[in-house]
C-alpha cells in the first residue's frame, strides 16, 4: 500500500562523524541509491548533469560496501509514530537521554512518523527498556518488543503552546500536471530528461526508510533464525528505483549454521539437529509460511499479509503501514541481488544511463506498455536491459558488455551462484570510462529509432556479449537473462504488446525528429520534446503526429493505385486530369 502524502525533512547529523564535501560533478554522478553522494545528503546533489556523462568515479564504493553501511545504519535506527502537535526540540531532548542522535527526519504516511538514527545501537536498548506495552480496555495487546514505537504526550497543551509544528517536505513523485509543467519549461530535451530523473529518483530519506523497513522485518524473522539477514534488492538498491516503487526483500539464511573456523578444532564435528524435507522448494515454502504467520500475528504495522507459496518464486506479500511500502519477501534469492549489483554498476558508470532509463520507463508507463499487474506486458527490468544493450551498441560504446566486466574481475570478484557464473568486477573505479560524448537528446531519439526497426522476429538481446544473436526459440521478445543464460527475462511478452511497443517507438522517434531543436516551445507552455512523448494515447499532439506521419505514406499508396489504374485498359484520363472509367466493351 503506497503512502499517502508522504513527506520528509532531513536533519543534519550531530555526531562527530565528519564527512568531506565532494565536487558537484561527482555528486551528480553518484546522486543515486547506495552511493557516496546519497550517504552525504541531498545538499550535495546538483540540478544539472554533465552532458557527456564522463566524470571522475574515484570516490565510488562497492555495492556490497554500500549495502553493509546501510544495514548498520538501519540497525541503529528506530521508527516512531508521533502525534501531529509534537515539539521537535523537546522530542530530540527526550531521545538524547538514551544517547546522541546522529540523524533524524519526519515524514507523513498514515500519520506523522519520525526516523531517528542513534550513534550507538546500545541507545536503542536503553530506549526500549524505558518503553512499555500499551494497555487497552477492550482489546489485548501482544507484547512484542520492536523498534517500531509509538509516542504519546503526557501533557499535549504544553507541547503546542507557541511552538511551530515540525516541517515535512513532499516525498511523493510529482503529479502528471506538475511533471508536464516542469518539462515544458525546460530549455532542451537534455534538460527535460534530467528534470524527470530528479523528480522521480529515490531520495536519501526514502532509501533510509527502505533499509529500516527491512531491518524491522529482520527482527521478526530472527526469532526463528537468529543469524538471518533481510536484504533489499531490485529497484530499492540498483539506482533505478522511483518514488513509490515496491520494496523487494529476501530472507538470506546463508549465515545460519556457518562454521566458525577458529572454533572448529579437535577430533569432533558438531551438527545441529534439524527437520528434513524432500526439496529446497518445500523448505522455502515452509520457512516463508512461518515468517508470514509471524508478520500477520506479531508484526507491528504489517497488514494485508498474503502467502503466495505456490508461485514459481514463493513469496509473502504485505503492506507496511509505518513506511507506506508494499513489500514482497522471498527467500535465498542471491541471483536477484547479484542482478541488482550489476545494474548498480551500470547506473554508476555514466550519468546518462539513469536519465535515459527513467525517461524510457516513464514513457512506457504513460502508454500502458508496462503494468503493475502481472501479464503479457514488458517489465521495467526488460526495458532497463534494453537501454543497457542500446548503450553497448553505440560507437564508441557508452557501457561495457558483461563479458568485458568479467574479464577485468579478480579472484575476489569470483561468484558462482546455483551453478551460474555471476562473476564481474565489483569495483567501479577499475572500469575505463567511455569516450562517447553523445547527448541525451540524440540518445533518446536513436533509442526509439533503433528498437522501432529492430528485427525482433529473428534476433535476441544479449548484454553479456553486447550484440544481436539469433533467437533460440519463437518468443516474440527474447532478452537473455544475464546470469541464467538459458532463460528469457521477457518470455511473458505477447506479440501484440511487442507490436504496440514497436509502433510507439517509431511514433516517438518521428515526434522527436520534427522538434525544432533550436527553438523549444517552452514559452507557449505546450508539451514538446519528452513531454510530447508522455502524452496519453488519443491526446491532440500524439494523434496529430501520427496523422502527419501517415499522410505521406497514404499519398504514396494513392499515387501507386492511380498509376496502376492509369495503365489499365479500363480507365482513361480527361483533359482536366480526372480519371474516367471507359464504357467500351
UniProtKB/Swiss-Prot annotation:
Listed Polar residues bias regions: 564-585
Chain residue ranges for the region called Disordered: 537-585
Ligand binding (Mg(2+)): 246, 248
SUPFAM superfamilies named among the record's database cross-references: Nucleotidyltransferase, PAP/OAS1 substrate-binding domain
Keywords: Acetylation, ATP-binding, Cytoplasm, Magnesium, Manganese, Metal-binding, Mitochondrion, mRNA processing, Nucleotide-binding, RNA-binding, Transcription, Transferase, Transit peptide
Catalytic activities: RNA(n) + ATP = RNA(n)-3'-adenine ribonucleotide + diphosphate
Any GO CC annotation of this UniProt entry: mitochondrion
Gene: Mtpap
Protein's organism: Mus musculus (Mouse)
Name the record gives this protein: Poly(A) RNA polymerase, mitochondrial
Main location (coarse class): cytoplasm
UniProt modified residues of type N6-acetyllysine: 90
CDD domains per record: NT_PAP_TUTase (cd05402)
Amino acid at each position: 500500500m503506497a503512502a499517502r502524502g508522504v513527506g520528509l525533512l532531513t536533519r543534519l547529523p550531530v555526531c562527530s562523524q565528519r564527512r568531506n564535501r565532494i565536487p558537484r560533478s561527482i555528486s551528480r554522478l553518484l546522486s543515486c541509491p547506495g552511493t557516496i553522494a546519497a550517504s552525504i545528503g541531498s545538499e550535495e546533489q546538483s540540478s544539472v548533469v554533465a552532458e557527456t556523462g564522463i566524470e571522475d568515479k574515484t570516490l565510488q564504493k562497492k555495492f556490497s560496501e554500500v549495502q553493509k553501511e546501510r544495514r548498520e545504519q538501519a540497525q541503529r535506527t528506530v521508527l516512531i509514530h508521533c502525534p501531529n502537535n509534537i515539539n521537535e526540540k523537546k522530542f530530540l531532548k527526550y531521545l538524547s537521554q538514551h544517547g546522541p542522535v546522529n540523524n533524524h527526519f519526519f515524514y507523513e504516511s498514515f500519520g506523522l512518523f519520525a526516523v531517528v538514527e542513534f550513534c550507538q545501537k546500545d541507545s536503542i536498548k536503553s530506549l526500549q527498556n524505558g518503553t512499555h506495552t500499551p494497555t487497552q480496555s477492550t482489546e489485548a495487546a501482544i507484547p512484542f518488543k520492536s523498534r517500531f514505537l509509538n509516542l504519546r504526550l503526557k501533557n499535549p497543551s504544553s507541547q503546542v503552546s507557541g511552538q511551530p509544528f515540525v516541517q515535512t517536505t513532499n516525498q511523493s513523485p510529482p503529479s502528471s500536471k506538475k511533471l508536464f509543467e516542469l518539462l515544458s519549461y525546460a530549455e532542451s530535451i537534455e534538460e527535460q530528461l534530467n528534470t524527470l530523473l530528479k523528480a522521480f529518483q529515490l531520495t536519501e530519506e526514502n532509501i533510509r526508510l527502505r533499509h529500516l523497513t527491512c531491518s524491522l522485518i529482520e527482527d521478526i524473522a530472527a526469532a526463528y533464525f537468529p543469524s538471518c539477514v533481510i536484504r533489499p534488492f531490485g529497484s530499492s538498491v540498483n539506482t533505478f528505483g522511483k518514488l513509490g516503487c515496491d520494496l523487494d526483500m529476501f530472507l538470506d539464511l546463508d549465515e545460519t549454521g556457518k562454521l566458525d573456523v577458529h572454533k572448529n578444532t579437535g577430533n569432533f564435528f558438531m551438527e545441529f539437529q534439524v527437520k528434513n524435507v524432500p526439496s529446497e522448494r518445500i523448505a522455502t515454502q515452509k520457512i516463508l509460511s512461518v515468517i508470514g504467520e509471524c508478520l500477520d500475528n506479531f508484526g507491528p504495522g504489517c497488514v494485508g499479509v498474503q502467502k503466495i507459496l505456490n508461485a514459481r518464486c514463493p513469496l509473502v506479500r504485505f503492506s507496511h503501514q509505518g513506511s507506506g511500502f508494499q513489500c514482497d519477501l522471498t527467500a535465498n534469492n542471491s541471483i536477484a541481488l547479484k542482478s541488482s549489483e550489476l545494474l548498480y554498476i551500470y547506473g554508476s558508470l555514466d550519468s546518462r544511463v539513469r536519465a535515459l532509463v527513467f525517461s524510457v520507463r516513464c514513457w512506457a508507463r504513460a502508454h500502458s506498455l508496462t503494468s503493475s499487474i502481472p501479464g503479457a506486458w514488458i517489465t521495467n527490468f526488460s526495458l532497463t536491459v534494453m537501454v543497457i544493450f542500446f548503450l553497448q551498441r553505440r560507437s564508441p560504446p557508452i557501457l561495457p558488455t558483461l563479458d568485458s566486466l568479467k574479464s577485468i574481475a579478480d579472484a575476489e570478484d569470483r561468484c558462482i551462484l546455483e551453478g551460474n557464473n555471476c562473476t564481474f568486477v565489483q569495483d567501479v573505479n577499475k572500469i575505463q570510462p567511455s569516450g562517447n560524448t553523445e547527448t541525451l537528446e540524440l540518445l533518446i531519439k536513436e533509442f526509439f529509432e533503433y528498437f522501432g526497426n529492430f528485427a525482433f522476429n529473428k534476433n535476441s538481446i544479449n548484454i553479456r556479449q553486447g550484440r544481436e544473436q539469433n533467437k533460440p526459440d519463437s518468443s516474440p521478445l527474447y532478452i537473455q537473462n544475464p546470469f541464467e543464460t538459458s532463460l528469457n527475462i521477457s518470455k511473458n511478452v505477447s506479440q501484440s504488446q511487442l507490436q504496440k511497443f514497436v509502433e510507439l517507438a517509431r511514433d516517438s522517434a518521428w515526434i522527436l525528429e520534427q522538434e525544432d531543436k533550436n527553438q523549444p516551445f517552452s514559452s507557449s507552455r505546450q508539451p514538446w520534446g519528452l513531454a510530447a512523448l508522455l502524452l496519453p494515447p488519443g491526446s491532440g499532439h500524439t494523434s496529430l503526429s501520427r496523422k502527419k506521419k501517415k499522410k505521406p505514406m497514404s499519398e504514396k499508396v494513392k499515387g501507386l493505385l492511380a498509376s496502376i489504374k492509369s495503365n489499365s485498359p479500363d480507365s482513361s484520363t480527361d483533359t482536366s486530369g480526372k480519371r474516367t472509367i471507359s464504357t467500351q466493351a
